[in-house]
Amino acid sequence: PLAFAQIKVGMVTDAGTIDDKSFNQGTWEGIQKAGKDLGVKTKYLKPTGTTEADYVKEISNLNDAGFKFIVTPGFKFETAIFAAQDKYSDAKFVLIDGSPNNGAFDSTRQEKVGPNTVSIFFAEHESGFLAGVAAALQIKTGDFGFIGGMEIPPVQKFNWGFQQGVAYANKNLGTKITIKDENVIYQGTFSDVAAGQQLAAQMFDKGVKVIFCAAGGVGVGAINEAKARAAKGVWIVGVDVDQYSQGEYAAKKSIILTSAMKRIDVAAYDMIKAEKAGKFPGGQTLTFNAKNDGVGIPAVDPNLSADTAKKT
């Protein structure tokens, strides 16, 4: 392990802020918990842009400042870590939701999880499934929708899992929920808040009762639209973290029905803990799933009845 008297854990954020109620925040919360529990020093840097060069620059800045255990959240860091793991071979890297590669999509493509890197993925379909079952049980009849960000595997897995969960509830638990093709939309970005609000408005206007958003900032727009219509009984299923507080529109009232969570915080924390114990799984690709508490729905979901909570 890195000499732990001096271990310093650094994080580079993606385009979002550290309190984005999503990937950056989840990662940082895990790192901060490690700071508290394990006595490691922590720091994050926000790049000025979103190119590989911008990311590598901040990785370099962390490394130069002695922050040699570096955690990066999201697939956008894949090429930066591919370069950095060789360049800074005495540092350790944790890439969440991605695997290091050179960014090529032809015969020149190279992929490598270096001996000083761990690549972490999540079984999104499992938490999507649980959220689908819970939402169907709670609402019982009507139309559901899905808004995704970019059409990439983690987002697709959330969508497919959610649809499977709803189908399971329809078949086995007496619910009658439909998800029409026209109400399954990938917006194409994770940042267009206005587009998210517009898409949600269109779906709600068509009578959709619940929208599952796996779309970062686009989902923030959908949440805002649902808040404006809270009196009409519309809901959002949150993603990545428990988004209940983000959906609050009045004291103790939220339009977040449940959330399909990826315990990004647990992943970051577990890797730092492994490093401290001299068991950093360098060179490996790990999957966090329902079995190892890596995904799931919140333990406390105020908008789900006791009966729904029991069945899920």
Question: Each predicted region: which residue ranges?
Answer:
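A residue-level marker of the well-folded mature domains of exported/periplasmic proteins
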Residues: 5-312
